[in-house]
Amino acid sequence: MTILAWIKDKKNKAILNTPEYSSQSSLSWCFTHKEAASNKAVSFINLSKRRALWTRCEKCGMIQFMRFFKENANLCLSCSYHHIMTSDERIALLVEKGTWYPLNETISPKDPIKFTDTQSYAQRIQSTQEKLGMQDAVQTGTGLINGIPFAIGIMDFRFMGGSMGSVVGEKLTRLIEYATKQGLFLLIVSASGGARMQEGIYSLMQMAKISAALNVYQNEANLLYISLCTSPTTGGVTASFAMLGDIIFSEPEAIIGFAGRRVIQQTLQQELPEDFQTSESLLHHGLIDAIVPRCFLVNAISEVASIFAYAPSKYKKLGNISHYHENTLSWATEEILRRNCINNKKVEYRTIEKIYQTTLYKESFFRLNKLLSKLKSEINFTNKMKKQNNAFNTSSVYANYYDVMLCNYNIGTHSLNLLFNEESEFCKYFPFNMDHMKKENRIKYNFITENSNDFIRKKTINDFSIMLIGD
């Protein structure tokens, strides 16, 4: 007897000796196991972890090997149809290896209106986060594109259809503010179904918040914002930041629109063109600037940025951010305030404002003391050089302070009085008094009077933004 025959014989004996097989007929045994299999829950987690070896093109239907498909940047090897990419794949495609630095990774969405459909919004968020390993539908960070530094935001359609909620809006707004402060070019890759209905008015508010941040970035800082619309880009994303770019690129055959094709067709009761809401149709009507295939995206983006960066100065308008302010609180404190505002409806508005002002007061003085020590060292160095050389020009040092910003922080009136008190330690080292500085227009006051329901960015009338400006 061969080894294979011996193994087969042992298997047959083991099957025949099982109690359920020996006591039942073959037909009854089949029916019993069929019912048990139907009642047994399917393990979707195990199925989702299995990697497919083959994939089918959504346009031409060609079956292709998954590894070759991924190496070709999710392009069909037959018809070059652009399939949806994940945010990680998009980062690997656009950003130089080793230069990606993520921002605001830890911000996670909450359930502000306790929304429930087939399951609660909180459960849906948790399951999606565990499945994808992401906190929300956008990744933000900085990186190099052909050697040019960019602030980059990339949306991921896998996370609840790339819908824009409070976290997506907050991360993009912080990214834009960071790019404004650092003077970086901005690239946002859109892939979204629109505003997230599970968050109600909180999601709709993000459209205005992102657009307001872009207004400062584009019209005051005069920096370059490139918008890349991928398939699909619809709803509130299209109605806000996706169409506000200085340059708007799109991938071939991308679906870009506001309402869905089926909704419009049912409303108008007439047939729509085949190319309706496609990037080719939008290019024909002038809504986008260029359709760029995926393989040329990096070169196209870097070329536009190079033209903008290296243009002669007479063709460029220098930006002046008159009322820009950076986040006054650390991200951890902001996150605590945000969650208290959204989740705890019992917390009163005055309580949140008091917490904000108290924390602001502490952090402002910490930063001012740090700045004060820096100014002390500068003045001591200047006095030392003046003793050694009487011809040493101290006025330029005093006037410019190496472009040090005294306060790009919002400081309350009480903090101002303590800071600029004649007996304060700061004024002992400061070379000019306040009246002299005002006459030379070296200090500008920008009163922030707007009231915002976004508690993190709430400012009071007593807040100032003071900046020491040189010649």
From Swiss-Prot:
This protein's name: Acetyl-coenzyme A carboxylase carboxyl transferase subunit beta
Residues the entry annotates as binding Zn(2+): C57, C60, C76, C79
Claim: Isomerase is one of the keywords in the record: no
Cofactor: Zn(2+)
Pathway noted in the entry: Lipid metabolism; malonyl-CoA biosynthesis; malonyl-CoA from acetyl-CoA: step 1/1
PANTHER family found in the cross-reference section: ACETYL-COENZYME A CARBOXYLASE CARBOXYL TRANSFERASE SUBUNIT BETA, CHLOROPLASTIC (PTHR42995:SF5)
Family designation: Belongs to the AccD/PCCB family.
Subunit and interaction comment: Acetyl-CoA carboxylase is a heterohexamer composed of biotin carboxyl carrier protein, biotin carboxylase and 2 subunits each of ACCase subunit alpha and ACCase plastid-coded subunit beta (accD).
Record NCBIfam families: accD
Species of the source: Helicosporidium sp. subsp. Simulium jonesii (Green alga)
One of the record's GO cellular component terms: acetyl-CoA carboxylase complex
Annotated keywords: ATP-binding, Fatty acid biosynthesis, Fatty acid metabolism, Lipid biosynthesis, Lipid metabolism, Metal-binding, Nucleotide-binding, Plastid, Transferase, Zinc, Zinc-finger
Enzyme Commission code(s) on record: 2.1.3.15
Catalytic activity: N(6)-carboxybiotinyl-L-lysyl-[protein] + acetyl-CoA = N(6)-biotinyl-L-lysyl-[protein] + malonyl-CoA
Gene: accD
Any Pfam family: Carboxyl_trans
